Amino acid sequence: MFKVYKKEIEVAGKKISLETGKVARQADGAIIASCGETVILATVVGAKKVNPDMDYFPLSVNYQEKYYAGGKIPGGYFKREARPTESEQLISRLIDRPIRPLFPSEFKNEVQLLPTVISYDKDNQPDILAITASSAALAISGMPFMGPVGASRVGLVDGKYILNPSKAELENSTLDLVVAGTKDAVLMVESETSGLTEEVMLDAVKFGHEGFVPVIEMIEELAKECRKPEWTVEKKDLSEVKKKLEENFTEDLTKAFATIDKQDRSNQISEISDKAKQLFADDENYSDFNVNDELKNLEKKIVRTDILKNKKRIDGRGLADVRAIECEVGVLPRTHGSALFTRGETQAIVVTTLGTSDDEQRLESLDGQHRERFMLHYNFPPFSVGETGRIGTGRREVGHGKLAWRAINSSLPPKEEFPYTFRIVSEITESNGSSSMASVCGASLALMDAGVPIKEPVAGIAMGLIKEGDDFSVLSDILGDEDHLGDMDFKVAGTKDGITSLQMDIKITGITFEIMEQALKQAKEGRIHILGEMNKALSESRADVGEHTPKMEQITVDKKDIAAVIGKGGATIREIVEKSGAKLDVNDEGVVTVAAPDEESRNIAMQMIKDITAKAELNKIYSGKVMKIMEFGAFVNFLGKQDGLVHISELATKRVEKVTDIVKEGDEVKVKVIGFDRGKVKLSMKQAAE
């Protein structure tokens, strides 16, 4: 019934297998990929007809993790997998980015790629396996895919690179890097580090590339045995369109791309586009899409030639020049920390809000439930590029936010030193390239403005590349048009000492490690320059948090005292909250976190906790409250939880006939500790008064 094809290989001591022919046989390509007990089903289907109204390649990648894969039932009221989580969206992008450039530009059929986690062992992470499975599904589908691609994760533990580390190994790693590409070239890099040098990062990319070449060879062997017939892709002859556009619009486009202002340049190009369409309006052989495609090719030729031959960029800068930078902090009066970062025509208002552990984000995944202390949200409204459009969070916003998150994360202080929860929001108010890196710079400034003791300021820069044959130019701080018309988008963020985050997307094959080395070197120079400009606004964190920030402090109590702090049925902790106005959180290790609206509230709560957990000291005088009257003396509560006996002979210097002659229940009194008897405290009011 089934004609099954299967290939296996061992990579980094783990067996990876690819199988096809048994499941999802009506898809154009279907692969069951497994590593350990983690299993991915990747399917791909392409529309058999081209949509004539499509002027782009409609590839959709939807990665999904099924809860049953880890033996779980989804939480919440509806027991079904809901909309994609942030993690699923990020992995979908991770799969899409190395695959998309490997389809020919004339291929416009709709393609849907669905990698699904159907078994998960909590040790072998599914994202790398999902890229492998997706690549294999495309390789056997017959579609015009110029792959296959492979992928690796690289860790760094004790100075040694680890290929495809387990989840446990990754927890001890100073590097989490994902690299994907073909046998000959790297196409995508995504990483988070603790601040590593350019040399270490480049070697990690090389190590990862070498690691996935055997996987690509396995996919190629599988495809030789079971690849479906190749799809035919019609390539329309547009030489006549190209010729007429060059004759009529080369001069106009050259002038347009010499215009520095983005909006003016965009308006000029739009007018040229309208004229170009009008030129072919009566020719039924060519659609507006055909004209648009060739006009874009002409734009690309003009800009790229100017950069390669004349070393001249669109806005007149040199190849390594960074646009003018303006930084301001404290721009919003009621926020905890804020910054306005402007670099050329790219601008971000970035705001830091500090909260308590109650504000941590609760996440559910195949690994279980966990809490996230640091959140960074990136918003890209259409007005930032002078357009109208949809408002909301898409994959692009999620991806840019996570990139900035990775850049900042390693510089944040640990919870033990600074017990706040962080939420950073980057509002992009203008955009002409590199808005995610503007978010990194603004986030660093906003954190320092909020009084967060970050380890080092962080800055980011986006690099570009123009390459024709062996001739290439690396561009620093690219514009939107340079990104669109160039061959590489290479974002690097870090401190003055090292890289904290790196993201690279390459649109062509043949990018050498020499080019990557040049880009990293140039990026470091740009990053140091940007940090210098940021330091002019604020060079270090403010000494304390702002006026409107919750005042937080932590105190560690003996585990034996946790019950005393909480009290019977929570009575004591409720009393502290009522009297101080602060919020309290007590964990199992005895760490008590106090969050208060102001200093006075925090001080009251802290003093009450100290009183409750303090130990009685011999000969020390305390304030107390008479709790019970007996014939032989009075029991007094002091230090919040401690009881002691004042014997009738220790009530006063004179002889006392009745205890009630001196005190009654509820009286506030001063007492001195005069001894201990089998764990009981002996007190004296008489000696306290002397």
Curated annotation (Swiss-Prot):
The enzyme's E.C. designation: 2.7.7.8
Swiss-Prot/TrEMBL keywords: Cytoplasm, Magnesium, Metal-binding, Nucleotidyltransferase, RNA-binding, Transferase
Cofactor(s) annotated in UniProt: Mg(2+)
Catalytic reaction annotation: RNA(n+1) + phosphate = RNA(n) + a ribonucleoside 5'-diphosphate
Domain KH, chain residue ranges per copy: 550-609
Enzyme class per UniProt: transferase
PROSITE patterns to which the protein is assigned, alphabetical: KH_TYPE_1, S1
One GO cellular component term: cytosol
Listed SMART domains: KH, S1
A GO molecular-function annotation: polyribonucleotide nucleotidyltransferase activity
Keyword RNA-binding assigned: yes
Lineage: superkingdom: Bacteria
Pfam families, A to Z: KH_1 (PF00013), PNPase (PF03726), RNase_PH (PF01138), RNase_PH_C (PF03725), S1 (PF00575)
Binding site for Mg(2+): D483, D489
Subcellular location: Cytoplasm
Function text: Involved in mRNA degradation. Catalyzes the phosphorolysis of single-stranded polyribonucleotides processively in the 3'- to 5'-direction.
Family recorded in the similarity comment: Belongs to the polyribonucleotide nucleotidyltransferase family.
Alphabetized PANTHER family for the sequence: POLYRIBONUCLEOTIDE NUCLEOTIDYLTRANSFERASE, POLYRIBONUCLEOTIDE NUCLEOTIDYLTRANSFERASE 1, MITOCHONDRIAL
Record protein name field: Polyribonucleotide nucleotidyltransferase
